[in-house]
Amino acid sequence: MVNDASSISRSGYTQNPRLAEAAFEGVRKNTDFLKAADKAFKDVVATKAGDLKAGTKSGESAINTVGLKPPTDAAREKLSSEGQLTLLLGKLMTLLGDVSLSQLESRLAVWQAMIESQKEMGIQVSKEFQTALGEAQEATDLYEASIKKTDTAKSVYDAATKKLTQAQNKLQSLDPADPGYAQAEAAVEQAGKEATEAKEALDKATDATVKAGTDAKAKAEKADNILTKFQGTANAASQNQVSQGEQDNLSNVARLTMLMAMFIEIVGKNTEESLQNDLALFNALQEGRQAEMEKKSAEFQEETRKAEETNRIMGCIGKVLGALLTIVSVVAAVFTGGASLALAAVGLAVMVADEIVKAATGVSFIQQALNPIMEHVLKPLMELIGKAITKALEGLGVDKKTAEMAGSIVGAIVAAIAMVAVIVVVAVVGKGAAAKLGNALSKMMGETIKKLVPNVLKQLAQNGSKLFTQGMQRITSGLGNVGSKMGLQTNALSKELVGNTLNKVALGMEVTNTAAQSAGGVAEGVFIKNASEALADFMLARFAMDQIQQWLKQSVEIFGENQKVTAELQKAMSSAVQQNADASRFILRQSRA
């Protein structure tokens, strides 16, 4: 009978899931398992009885039971077939109830074992949580201390950067020739060293802070994971520990979030101030280089101008000496019969042009250009030197005419050489006088030629050959008259002597002209060299400007990388807040259940 009842019970649970649902639902919703078992038994009996009755709905799950006494033996004998069937069904239901109670008792034992196990596990997890919570607290304190160290290192770095900028600005305002330039340069080097050390200390502190923040976040997450395991315990003491742990954990998470926000603010502020300091430094360097470039550009223009002035001055001197050389060569040609015409050919074109211009306009441009120099410089110098040499020759017994002629010749040569030397020295050392002299000579020559060239071309086109012939005749007759007035003999020997002397004079003047042009070339080369050095310094400063632009670009890129780090920290903080919110929602759902 028991086996039959068991089979009926099992088949009832299998075929009608409402039996299991009614029993299990009562067990889950009540903490008093004995009452739950009694109610479940009544629900099972009511459900089974409803299935056996034809007019009963299967949805009825509860009936009111009445206590009945079992029938006596006499009553059993008097029972009809219907009564016997009813008695049999009653015994069957009693057996079915006994089986259900035994199953419920076994399940109750299982639940009690599970509760004890959860209690032990809760106590163990509570200990682990307290340990993890202590570690999270220590890591959070370390993270807070690291943030303070980072802030201190940042302040030191800002001060060092400011000191470096001030030292560099002071150095830029000084000239390398100033007495305090070396001291300012040493101060810049020392400030740069301090700024580098402060930057390294700041980087180390930042790295330590990042590591401490990562460690604190990991340990806080570990505490959260342990806290999640606490939710399955049913022990009241354990529940109290869990509640206290939740409060501690929530406060720690909030504190960790605040510290992460502070660190993100410090990193962002440090990045922005670092970029501003770099921009200020690069602007100072750029302004210094720009001032240097302007200075070198002015030096280049000045040296180029000096070279041009020297070239113009030497050109004027060459013209003057060329004219003198041509005059002497032509005069010598008269006495030597053409032996020095090769030497005269160098300046003949200038002299012929001058004679043509003079014949056409009545004005000699060479005479007009050389009059100020001849009247105020060369003529007094020639007279002074000539008189000194004449007196010296007369003291040696030379006749007066010969001494005067030799003194005039030597005086002219020495005066020309002295004039060349003075102009070269002034051009190299005293630049202002040379510039004035060169400007005066070039202006006189330029204005004279500018006025006379149109008339020259016009007259030359009309009667060039006639003017050339007249000019040469005037030169020859003029030279003859000069020789006669000076008392020179006209015989062949005297002419040859005078011609040789004039050839020597012409040769000396040619050497002087060559020396003057060489000296001018050297002076011009010096100025060109100085201009080249100024141009090289200018190009170097320009390269430094390009390098500063490259450094500025790198600073902007570093700023972008630091912004990425800040974004990652913000993302980590948002993730921590999200996890905290999820844990809070989970706890809220469990408390409502």
UniProtKB/Swiss-Prot annotation:
Membrane topology: Multi-pass membrane protein
Official protein name in the record: SPI-1 type 3 secretion system translocon protein SctE
Recorded phenotype for the gene knockout or disruption: Mutant can assemble a fully functional needle complex and can secrete (but cannot translocate) all proteins traveling the SPI-1 T3SS pathway, but the mutant is defective for intimate attachment.
GO BP field: killing of cells of another organism; protein localization to Golgi apparatus
Family: Belongs to the SctE/SipB/YopB family.
Species in which this protein is naturally found: Salmonella typhimurium (strain LT2 / SGSC1412 / ATCC 700720)
Keywords: Coiled coil, Host membrane, Membrane, Secreted, Transmembrane, Transmembrane helix, Virulence
Regulation: Secretion is regulated by the gatekeeper InvE/SctW.
